[in-house]
Amino acid sequence: MNTPMPSSTDDLIEALAEIEHEQWRHWSQAVAPKVGTGISDGWRKSWVNYAELTEELKEADRVWARKVFALLRERRLIE
């Protein structure tokens, strides 16, 4: 992932969402052999780069990105 430094809150949320998706993809691929094929088959369609996700799936990652953003702001690590 070669994301440029975010220049706004929205850019930061989007960058965090991309990282969240990458983390989920690595985790889900690692545990896929241990879960039922019905579950992992459903995940496979999301094993793509963040930019290739549907807006609905991107928004699911943004939900978690906003939680990280809120924590960073609460701890005064960002303004």
Where are these regions (language model features)?
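Alpha-helical propensity feature that highlights long, continuous alpha-helices across diverse contexts
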Residues: 1-79
